[in-house]
Amino acid sequence: MDFPSRFDVIVIGGGHAGTEAALASARMGVKTLLLTHNVETLGHMSCNPAIGGIGKSHLVKEIDALGGAMALATDKSGIQFRVLNNRKGPAVRATRAQADRAIYKAVVREILENQPNLWIFQQNCDDLIVEQDQVKGVVTQMGLRFFAESVVLTTGTFLGGLIHIGLQNHSGGRAGDPPSIALAHRMRELPLRVGRLKTGTPPRIDGRSVDFSVMTEQPGDTPIPVMSFMGNAEMHPRQVSCWITHTNARTHEIIASNLDRSPMYSGVIEGVGPRYCPSIEDKIHRFADKESHQVFIEPEGLNTHELYPNGISTSLPFDVQLELVRSIRGMENAHIVRPGYAIEYDYFDPRDLKYSLETKVIGGLFFAGQINGTTGYEEAGAQGLLAGTNAALRAQGRDSWCPRRDEAYIGVLVDDLITLGTQEPYRMFTSRAEYRLILREDNADLRLTEKGRELGLIDDQRWAAFCAKRDGIEREEQRLKSTWVRPNTEQGQAIVDKFGTPLSHEYSLLNLLARPEIDYAGLIEATGGEAIDPQVAEQVEIRTKYAGYIDRQQDEIARLRASEDTRLPVDIDYTTISGLSKEIQGKLSQTRPQTLGQASRIPGVTPAAISLLLIHLKKRGAGRELEQSA
């Protein structure tokens, strides 16, 4: 049979993790196969039609900075864009976009189909070929065998997926799609820790049955933001508004009186749901003192009447769903197009992974996305890109790569997962990062694109745009530094008139920009400078105003990095290290951290224990030096 069976990398699953993994691998020049159960659902948004948000947009921008597809697909499909936390500092500002679900999926598929080195094939994966603790390939549903150096599993909610509506349940990967049962059984045979998690989705509403006049309109921002460093507002489709309404006492009464029919509260569902995206049942139960909860009415697209009521995810029986929806203001006559549901699925303890997202026990087998216990398109895409990159690096015989916590939110995400593990779906927040001021969404390209180019992820067009931006920032900062304004001159008076800022002596424009009351656009207007790229202007202003704080964080990072990156030997026996408590010895032996920094983030491992480890490593190193000299 003249059909390719040997590849460098095989990716299982065509969701947000799988598409980024396959694209990253193929961009690096290795022969990549993407196996999906249905080509029509590549890049499908299974839950809400939105990308970005607090902490999440930072991941999207980092994916973009490394050449990924998510941000550009969002710019081409986004029907509403907003910057959250706009009145706060740049560290926590976050771009969020409502996407047209159909356009987003179409854009992702177009990118995949036009990516060199990438083969797409519609088949379920039912088995892994493993020999001597090394993955060698996969077996599909119809018995085809494909071989590769690396395999990336991005199975989402499909592994052993079980859909719940009320007390009834059935197998499914998501509504309308079959689960991966054979692969789930195969995975449970491997020496990996497995658990069950749960997520859910609300009923979809026909917009023609909704009264928007009694809701609060939520328009997008003007000027319209963009998500990709390569994007622009001209890419965006027509922009629309979202709407806000609220639950009420009647809604809560309906839910509370039917909790005995909820699979979550009747013991039918065993998996743990996402803490930060709870079902409406959870909200009513956990926050019984609250009189109402916000419901965001989000359009599913420009060519459909379907609406996504964000905030009422539920797995209650359909008759209860209908009653609770119709109790909400503006939805008294609502028609439900699709019922809400909960889904349980298998995930694997991410503490069994290396930083590369390769499993510790099966060489060449990588995990990305919900299989690692995360929730969210952005978290999945970030892991997919990293896993695909490292799968390709392994196939090329090169060292693996993962950004540190002080380099990227991707680094924070991976370090949290493989060090701490998770017992509930993990969601990214800016509060999880220690160095938020350095890890802003606006500078993701300055942090990561050079590394992406080195890895082979960045094409010539993106590299040229990045270099132009980087050089433009340097030129403008130098211009501001070397341009001086004196009191009692035309420029000096213009600054006083514009900002009410008296000039007591000569200042450089860079010194003036550092003042909190002076903004870059106003400074250029007052001093007659030329307009420059808005991305360059943004960087110049942020870097200047926050220079002191940024320098302080950089100094702190430099101090910590020496011990943070100290490697712990694979064969280290923690039970032989005197001074460590039995509890800490047990935690270190179970987790097997790769570095001192990772060890320090294990719950219960004290600073004193880290000091003992450092002393042990120094003694061990000195002892080996003596052995070698003898």
Curated annotation (Swiss-Prot):
Keywords: Cytoplasm, FAD, Flavoprotein, NAD, tRNA processing
GO terms assigned for molecular function: flavin adenine dinucleotide binding
Cellular component GO terms, alphabetical: cytosol
Annotated residues for binding of NAD(+): 273-287
A biological process term (GO) from this entry: tRNA methylation
SMART domains xref list: GIDA_assoc_3 (SM01228)
HAMAP family recorded: MnmG_GidA
NCBIfam families: mnmG_gidA (TIGR00136)
Family the entry assigns: Belongs to the MnmG family.
Protein name, per record: tRNA uridine 5-carboxymethylaminomethyl modification enzyme MnmG
Organism: Pseudomonas putida (Arthrobacter siderocapsulatus)
